[in-house]
Amino acid sequence: MRTNIVIPMKDPQLSKTRLDPQLSSRQRQALALSMFKTTLSFFNKYFPQHHLLVVTASEFISDIACTYGASVLIETKLGLRQAVESAARWSLNNDFQSQLLIPADIAELDYREFERLLMIYRPVPSVLLCPAFDLGTNALLTTPPNAIPFLYGIDSSLAHQRVAQERDIVCQVIKLPALALDIDTPDDLELLALLSSPVTQELNKLCKTA
């Protein structure tokens, strides 16, 4: 089953605004860019068999994505929902049977978690999601790519489950501890400070010195 891995990414100048005033604008941009590049590098290294698509309105981000061998979909409309809807259409038009949406702000990506996620049996149609600690959606695997509407926002993992149930679509929820931590709020920064891997240490350093 051909799976398209989709990474939406804002212009770094517009990223991580909820971390203000804990981080300066420069720190927020450095943090967002570091996590984005780490995400691209991770999938290139561990899952080269899967196609990568970056959805962005930023030419700067587009150029970075291309250096990692990712395809780019320029989406100028505002909002994550519009971006991922465009990505789903792109996935369908390019003959992908599944689409995996991943944010570019996961603190630490774990190969074993993604291997488990991608190996789970997926009937057609189906939805497989990994909730964030705050009940957002940190991974959304849809088969076909447009199996359900995309409902990002507060408690979006619950919203995605509800819409799948309303449509009688199989929805599996898998809880993965590393994938559950995205960096969006001051509380997330506090959790990040408790982690000690090389990747998270580098992120913590950026938050203090950039």
UniProtKB/Swiss-Prot annotation:
Q: Name one GO molecular function term.
A: GTP binding
**Origin: domain of life:** Bacteria
Pfam families named among the record's database cross-references: CofC
Q: Which UniProt keywords apply?
A: GTP-binding, Nucleotide-binding, Nucleotidyltransferase, Transferase
Biological process annotations from GO:
F420-0 metabolic process
Named in its record, the pathway it takes part in is:
Cofactor biosynthesis; coenzyme F420 biosynthesis
Protein known as: 3-phospho-D-glycerate guanylyltransferase
Please give the organism: Colwellia psychrerythraea (strain 34H / ATCC BAA-681)
Q: Which gene encodes it?
A: fbiD
